[in-house]
Amino acid sequence: MFPRFSFNRPVLIASLSIALLSCSAISYLAATQIPEPKNEPKIIDPGDGTRAPSDAIVLFDGKSLSNWVRVLDGSPAQWEVKDGAMVVKAGTGTIRTRSEFGDIQLHIEWATPAEVKGEGQGRGNSGVFLQGLYEVQVLDSYNNKTYFYGQAGAIYKQYPPLVNASRKPGEWQTYDIIYHEPIFGAGDTVKKKATMTVLHNGVLIQDHAEVYGPTTHEPIFPTYRKHGKGPIILQDHGNPVRFRNIWVREL
């Protein structure tokens, strides 16, 4: 004969409830706890002054255009190198990097001519194209009226800058751009649009803006076409805009 056991039903139910709650709490904590990082951040030299970070790819060092070619035919870039800067030589053509990139941090310094000529889009005009397709406008926008999404720092014909942070003509200016390329699915299906964050002279002017598509000259919705990595392009718009200290970090 088996011995008889006496159970206190309320106590048993309470004990089981506590056990279940404990298990639920442990499961919840496991599901919501921030995972501990496994990899120690890489140590780099951030550089000082105009010196690029140690993990950057220098695209223009103030001496040579060896990293640049003409968009038209791939021949060597014909812009002028003077006083540590490359200068647009009107009519020689838009140039691009030999290398191609995806997600990047881009630093570039530029200056429009000190002598003001023209107005609107005819004054110190150039452009920086990410992956050869998506333009951040370069323009003398200091006391220079033009359409809003054509100002310096605009994602051209898509987004005006949040503020106009332009310096006087002839003064050096900086763009720091965080660019994430679009992600495509089957065919030309866009799973995620390209995004840009832009700082102009240290001031935020584009805040994780979703790019509608490749730059067009008309204010119409552009259409994405599936692509891979692409070059950085600097535009010859006929004005002697200067560029220097150009580098990227691949993200």
Name each model-derived stretch.
Residues 26-251:
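Carbohydrate-interacting regions of secretory-pathway proteins
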Residues 13-24:
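Bacterial N-terminal signal peptides
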Residues 1-7:
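N-terminal secretory signal peptides that target proteins for export/translocation
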